[in-house]
Amino acid sequence: MLDFKILEKIPNKSGVYIFKKGEEYIYIGKAKELKKRLTSHFKAKDGKSKLIVEEADDLQVILLDNEKEALILEANMIYKYKPKYNAMLKDTQVYPYIRISNDEIPYLEIVRNRKGEGEFYGPFTNVYFTRQLFEVLRKVYKFRTCKRDITKLKKPCMDYHLGLCSGVCINEESPEDYKKKINEVKNVLKGKFSNVISFIKLKMEQHARLLDFENAAKYRDILLNFNKVMESQGVVLPESVNIDLVVGKHKTFLVFKIRSGYLISKLVYEYDGHIVDFIELFYTQNTSDIPEKIIVEKENKELKNIAKILGIKIAQAKDDLELQLLNKAIDNLNYEIGLILTNKIILKQMKELLGLMKLPNRIEGIDISHLAGKNTVASLVVFENGEIKKEEYRRYKLGDILDDFESIRIVVKKRYTKHNVPDLLFIDGGIGQVNAAYQSLKEIGKERECDVIGLAKEEETIVTLHGEIRLAFDHPVLRLLVKIRDETHRVANEFTRNLSTKKSLRSILDEIKWIGPKRKKTLLERYTSIEEILSVSRSEIEQLIGKKATESLLNELSYRRNL
């Protein structure tokens, strides 16, 4: 428990404060007046504040110039460290983003979360819309999508030959011009869709003036495709304005994102907090796309303060059109709350919709992962009554098998020869993977004891032995299956990476002077990668293997990392 005296040296300035227990972040907060806010935590007689102070053994503060800096840092740290006493935004489905990397010559990609560095635009509700928008922008602006180190490239990739990349890697376009182009893409992703329309029309006219009608026709087709993509989202405002509508109740919040008059996203989150806290957290975690205005049901003093800090306008609906949109958002929120059912009801729905033999109280999910056919592994995750059971997870090493179907057959046979089958076996993949699992169950005489289904990644289509089933992206049954799929994928990929890095480290250690079998074993028991060894102090390694061996080890690893 922390002593009240720790507050004596803390100034009454803006900043972020961090309660820690050992190395674990248990609560992160921000304050305009740090000392005043922390004093209220320490004086609390009950509730969360009392628990935090009693559990923490360390308190750190970061002083900042103003409340806005504190707000943004707090949100980013909460997102990164996920302290247990901070309320978190919980996605009710997997939303795609478009990420622009931090490289000197950035590449763009569609991602399913905000992990890693770079600028994230979105989230978008509709996967199809996101892909179509990305492809149109790619054809227009010809940005790179490859992740290779372009400073070492001598030949362009296939995208260049297909006219999808400008060839900045081989100096076909200057870095300066490329960066200007990326800034244009950023503006479009912030909702300035008229920019891309003007750009396409300009290119079309330029080619027509040069009597290059073939390329003029290409840009005409791109423009038609772009208009079709945008029209699929529906025009909700006659003016090209960028606004959001935020409504919430019963620990559920909904955000309508309107860009250039188009409704491009309907986002739903579970969050145990007030609308002020939700808006603060949501917009400080999505700083790349903050609208001109946020419409809410009711204004209050706290919302005005957040608006001032973020430099945006938060207000009630001002006319009939905005009021109609607000009511539409409220109707959608009520619908979403109705969809957030208990796990029991979701599982009952799953049984009925998928035609399962029994209620899927126990679901086991399998995924295969490998690196170019090497270090093939399988993950098996367990969900009981819709909840994760991490303690029952299993991981399997499969050697260098190239065939995913064969890998699935091996794992299913190995697992269920010795263990009872679950109510439902979930496979990350399509009909081929589902059939492989079913045939393996048939070999051991258990095919009648459980159902087997898969989830095809492209359009989140549910695959059964009898056909395909498509559900709305926000349907609770699909949300649960996506959650299982993502968990199997995460566990399998994590296992593959760990095996790969350890195998790589093992082979490197074999070549280093002064590192024999005994020292090699000591290092492998303690560290899993080159990066991990280079991140610790020299003295720590010297205590394990001695000074000479440490010198030789660090020199070799540093050299290899810089290759």
Swiss-Prot record:
Q: Where found, per UniProt?
A: Cytoplasm
Per the entry, what this protein does is: The UvrABC repair system catalyzes the recognition and processing of DNA lesions. UvrC both incises the 5' and 3' sides of the lesion. The N-terminal half is responsible for the 3' incision and the C-terminal half is responsible for the 5' incision.
Please state every residue range assigned to the domain named UVR.
194-229
What is the protein named? Answer: UvrABC system protein C
What's the main place this protein lives? cytoplasm
Pfam families, alphabetized: GIY-YIG, UVR, UvrC_RNaseH_dom
Example of a GO cellular component annotation carried by this entry: excinuclease repair complex
Any GO BP annotation: SOS response
Family affiliation: Belongs to the UvrC family.
Do the record's keywords include Cytoplasm? Answer: yes
Tell me the gene name.
Answer: uvrC
Mind listing the UniProt keywords for this protein, alphabetically? Cytoplasm, DNA damage, DNA excision, DNA repair, Excision nuclease, SOS response
What is the annotated quaternary arrangement, including any partners?
Interacts with UvrB in an incision complex.
A GO molecular function for this record? DNA binding
What NCBIfam families has UniProt attached to this entry?
A: uvrC
Which residues are in the GIY-YIG domain? 12-87
InterPro entries, A to Z = GIY-YIG_endonuc (IPR000305), GIY-YIG_endonuc_sf (IPR035901), GIY-YIG_UvrC_Cho (IPR047296), RuvA_2-like (IPR010994), UVR_dom (IPR001943), UVR_dom_sf (IPR036876), UvrABC_protein_C (IPR050066), UvrC (IPR004791)
